[in-house]
């Protein structure tokens, strides 16, 4: 195995270089960067995009447990359809317009803890494919 191959293999180990996100701005920047490389699911961004605190982790495994505002996070990401059901949303208070115009998004996020959320306004506006319940 070459040194480059070893580095790339390590780079794709979930959590190898990851840290939690602490605010909406750094999470939104990482989403934008990741989806510029892999607009459908955020999987191929592993080892190719600089996703801030997530390092090279795939979007599905990002630690978002400290983020309180996810408003407009996937707004206008029309092709996005990643399984982000494992995200810890227990601290989130704002999900307003989170999937606004994310036309392809249709993943089951019903297990998300939304007890702290006070704003879900237009959360799924123009998210035509979405067909699950959340509580």
Protein language model annotation of sequence segments:
Residues 1-7:
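Classical eukaryotic N-terminal signal peptides for Sec-dependent ER targeting/secretion
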């Amino acid at each position: 195995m070459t040194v480059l191959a070893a580095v790339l293999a390590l780079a794709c180990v979930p959590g190898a270089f990851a840290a939690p996100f602490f605010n909406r701005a750094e999470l939104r920047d990482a989403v934008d960067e990741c989806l510029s490389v892999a607009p459908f699911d955020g999987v191929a961004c592993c080892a190719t995009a600089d996703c801030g605190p997530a390092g090279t982790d795939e979007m599905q495994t990002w630690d978002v447990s400290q983020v309180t505002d996810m408003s407009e996070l996937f707004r206008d990401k029309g092709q996005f359809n990643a399984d982000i059901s494992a995200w810890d949303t227990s601290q989130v208070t704002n999900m307003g317009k989170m999937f606004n115009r994310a036309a392809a998004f249709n993943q089951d996020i019903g297990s998300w803890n939304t007890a702290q959320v006070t704003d879900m306004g237009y959360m799924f506006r123009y998210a035509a494919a979405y067909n699950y319940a959340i509580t």
